[in-house]
Amino acid sequence: MSGIPFPAIDPVAVELGPIVIRWYALAYLAGFLFGWWYCTRLARAIPGRPTPDDLSEFLTWAIVGVLLGGRLGFVLFYNLDYYIQHPLQALAIWSGGMSFHGGLTGIVAAILLYGWRHGFSPFALGDLVAVAGPVGLFLGRIANFVNGELWGRPAPDLPWAVIFPDPRAGGVPRHPSQLYEAALEGLVLFAVLAWLASKPAVRERTGTLSGTFLVGYGIARILGEVFREPDVQIGYLAFGVTMGQILSVPMVLIGLWILVRAPFGPVRTPAAAAAGR
């Protein structure tokens, strides 16, 4: 049995007395900042709203939606029994424990509320967020690897298997599934969405990019979970599937529905923007 020893990476990026900043927190910060920059860049190329000013205002909504939704999703989907017994711990977001599907629900709620409040289609905003989202996912998965958490299933004969230092990993070589997910959910999905967003006919058809993100992420997550060790407090569910796979199936179905309806939805052309559509 071989395996690559986990590199000696300190999960703490900066420590100044009582102030401790982890790479995981910096990954979130970098993801939000990149998302804001990239979305405003896209918004300038698409007529109508949301405008770059809208996106600057929406940034706060996005941060709140992702953090609250991500934490609530982790509490409800992954460790509900524990938090029923220790309810105050649900507020300790700094102690770790975030759910992508919860964060997605939170930002979708923020998109719907912001679009409704400002009088434009939430799909127009969702399309921009969808293109930038995979970069945040990539950074988050890299931070998971740096933290030595969410490791993969045992793979004693895999040449690139990693031996994670956490005693709960059992000292056996495992798939570096965080890196697989960083590639699939992050790099590959971003490349596809950025290419589609470069096509005026695609980016002006509201809903196409949102639907593609949901389908693409759902498939990538279902595949990535094949190599990822399930959360110990949940394990495998019915028929050997994981919670992450179950939560990803509705994403794919909703994404397909959005893609089917997108050709019949509004088009963000200069003429449509001038007409106030």
Swiss-Prot record:
| Transmembrane stretches, start-end | 16-36, 58-78, 93-113, 119-139, 182-202, 207-227, 239-259
Pathway, per UniProt? Protein modification; lipoprotein biosynthesis (diacylglyceryl transfer)
- PROSITE patterns to which the protein is assigned, alphabetical: LGT
State the Gene Ontology terms under molecular function.
phosphatidylglycerol-prolipoprotein diacylglyceryl transferase activity
Lipid bilayer topology: Multi-pass membrane protein
Q: Name one GO cellular component term.
A: plasma membrane
Question: Where located?
Answer: Cell inner membrane
Query: Which keywords does UniProt give here?
Result: Cell inner membrane, Cell membrane, Membrane, Transferase, Transmembrane, Transmembrane helix
Positions contributing to a 1,2-diacyl-sn-glycero-3-phospho-(1'-sn-glycerol) binding: R141
Function of this protein? Catalyzes the transfer of the diacylglyceryl group from phosphatidylglycerol to the sulfhydryl group of the N-terminal cysteine of a prolipoprotein, the first step in the formation of mature lipoproteins.
**What is the protein name for this chain?**
Phosphatidylglycerol--prolipoprotein diacylglyceryl transferase
**Species assigned in the record:** Rhodospirillum centenum (strain ATCC 51521 / SW)
